[in-house]
């Protein structure tokens, strides 16, 4: 029986044959209507009735065996024997499929029975990383009894395409899932696309946890090789305590952690934050002399309010919480420095506490929060003070002695080309733009094609004359955009056979029930060109690709083959298509949230830990005066502002060959190749020009985006790129002294007139023409060295006019009379945004070193 589903599951129709379903779908012009092959058989439920007499649910999960050597057909056969006996007694049915070391399992039964069995599976020491791929109601059983016979992939099929794609996508899928925020990961696993979900207002308790004086720790010349160790410790401590208390970690921002809880877990949140402070304070007694983690201390701010849970951006996305309350939380965290308190929380948080915890609170303190006209009431618990100046003095006096970190920092340009890691996308761009402000060029989408082009540049032996000993295997899975008839498949087969024979590509294309699975072998360049053609094929969608290390010899014969999976595989295991479909969609969606360098390295069969530390330039962008703009804006307007901003930034950045490091609401950080500073300047020019033209396009409309202005800062220096975390959540960090310094350079965009929209700290890496004619020095200096701005009146930023325009917008929308300019000058007493600790992105340690003026 075949089932056709459309209108997001609201309409369902069954057919006896696949041709009937395909004809009905084509005649009805349904573009998004998946078809499922289902075998329904009677079975006895745990309550003794038929499967129609009880509510059935189908649970599908992926796990990894803790001992891959034992995950062989004999091991799976023993699992089948035991599971058949036990699960038949309670009325469970399903199948188990193995592709060592991964296990795919679908279970059907009642809610109570499934919950009980999955709890046992999760606690089974033979499994780890149990990931739920699907958990939804079903109308009938695919298997009348517990079916595990011939469940090993080697037994059910001889097609290497199926074994390859399941193993490779499962490996990359489970690895990349650790980089995703839990909310986005849960949506992907439930079959939802986070980008398609509408923004959801939520009442949450939010915290920002800072590593005290982390910028100074990065700037210390004796600790530049230890940031990875410091951050890995910080990530592990936060994950253990925050997630253990029911919190959800939204993101890590170098030395900062952002997390949230539901309002009924406020006491658990404060307890977890206090425990983090205590755990870090105990590190000095547990570390070897000269180790940087002995200098780790934390300070946190906690606040409660309404925020918008939403997806911002398209090409590169950030699934996060947005809202004015989020900015206020980060400002409360910066006040902890002034009050020397490890944990500081607002009056709204205090109202959510029970009587017992309220009795422990010290007296209230009223203080001015940056960006707010009205003071904020804060509270703290009694305990030892956390003096930032004392911590800074310890860092200045720090010497590692004989202690040496295992991670060595090297110069990217000094490495031989064959040994350089593929952390930069230097693929040819479509229609390169001239280096002139405001020049429009066709945007190049950043997709999974780019990492696979980068994969072709990985170091490796050259292709031999025959191409048979060094050919890599590339696999992909995709969905047909329309029903494929035998004539369509014959046309695909004829074209593929002719073209691939000329390119010396061999492999297998498997088709069944609207699903394409393909593995191919051949020269790298030919495979990449073929992949590009596949992605441009309008007959396919949701193309998810993966890559295997190079085999010693070809697996496939010289002839290209096409196999119909309907008769040989999918008819035997109907859920197999569902497994592949869900893995493909989730794997494709992950790329927008996971750093591209991680995707490219994982899909090339490498470990991200092996990425060598390099020296590179850093660019940082920021929406100026966002706090005063969002203070009187609704949550949907905040989301609209950040969504527009995040869409514009990665487009301009990736177009110039850079990589996005982090999307942080109204801030985007990225890195450029150290030898291509001119591209960083061109990207900054495009961003500022886009913002100006966007404001001009809606100048006659009362739209909050009409007051948005960008400030862009450029700096270069040495950073460490490393994978941090071992407690289930992984963060790929890019950290160095330049990470903190570029934030201070960005503060020049709000300095005294003229305000430079694109300041840069060093001009050493610019081309002679741009250095001599394209930049001018600024009055401000950082660390005794001059800063520069891009020449031209169009690149000056008038913050006073921006703030005046914001207040005029709010006054016009509320029906009030706008203030005149003299009155505005008298009343404009808001301290605005000081970049030391701004929005959860500022390191506390860099304060007091600069001579720049901030508002």
Swiss-Prot record:
BLUF domain residues: 56-149, 471-563
Any one cellular-component term (Gene Ontology): motile cilium
SMART domains hit by this protein: BLUF (SM01034)
Comp. bias (Basic and acidic residues): 813-827
Subcellular location, principal: other
Keywords: Cell projection, Cilium, Flagellum, Repeat
Recorded superkingdom: Eukaryota
CDD domains, per the entry: CHD
Pfam families: BLUF
Subcellular location: Cell projection, Cilium, Flagellum
Keyword Zinc: no
Residue stretches of biased makeup (Polar residues): 842-855
GO molecular function: blue light photoreceptor activity; FAD binding
Region annotation (Disordered) ranges: 420-444, 813-855
Alphabetical list of PROSITE patterns matching this protein: BLUF
GO process terms (BP): cyclic nucleotide biosynthetic process
Further remark: The 1224-5/9F strain is deficient in phototaxis. It is not known if this is due to defective adenylate cyclase activity or defective BLUF domains in this protein.
Quaternary data: Heterotetramer of two alpha and two beta subunits.
UniProt-recorded name of the protein: Photoactivated adenylate cyclase subunit beta-like protein 1224-5/9F
